Amino acid sequence: MASPDRHFANAAIFTHSTGLTPNSGDAALYIKSDNKAYIKDSAGTEAAVGGGGTKTYAVFNANDNQPPATNFATLDTRNSIAILDFDDTTDESAIFLGIIPEAAVLGSGLKIRLIWTATTATSGDCVWDAALERMNTDIDTDSFDTAASVTTTTNGTSGVPNYSEITLTTIDSVVAGDGFRLKITRDANNASDTMTGDAELIAVEVRSAA
């Protein structure tokens, strides 16, 4: 039987040996300890296959909100786009429910990406919080893990979307296949939240932080 590290002219070699340098005209393809595929040419140059892009695990829009019983963001529309209005004086929240997909990489936590705009403001900062709950306890009681936050200055032109990203490392020990709830809150009473008027949440992305 031929060795898996055997060279063939102008061929891709599938190998477990990350230290292998292919012969001229060959390329080596292998999986590293981070479970990502890499390719190496005969000059020894290594590159991640597929560009090493991040993985999106869930996407939510305003209509996916399952609001809390009190202090909830209000469903609204803007130019027929569904949005959630978050007050500038009271902390209001939205909750989204999903399932962590198979083969999700969670060792570094999750990144929560928010797309939002201001109702009228063209200046000021908005503070957003994100908290995750693993759905493995009594659903009659909330059990969200510690929240993480981000502060973003709103766009200087009304109606232009802002993009805020929160790195969430406290993820309630969630694993692939688990149901989860994600709570998004505008921390309106935070001294760093200086934006006047509502913040309008358009969409939320949950993706790998790796």
Task: Name each model-derived stretch.
Residues 122-129, 197-201:
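Short coil-to-beta strand junction motifs in C2/discoidin
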Residues 75-89:
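Short carbohydrate-recognition loop motifs
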Residues 1-16, 36-79, 136-164:
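Glycine-rich, low-complexity segments
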Residues 186-210:
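Proprotein-processing/basic-patch segments
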Residues 23-40:
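Short hydrophobic/aromatic-rich beta-strand motifs
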Residues 102-107, 117-125, 136-138, 191-192:
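Extended, low-complexity, turn-rich repeat/linker tracts enriched in Gly/Pro/Ser/Thr and Asp/Glu
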Residues 162-191:
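Cysteine-clustered segments with highest specificity for TGF-beta superfamily mature ligands
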Residues 88-104:
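Short beta-strands within extracellular/lumenal beta-sheet-rich domains
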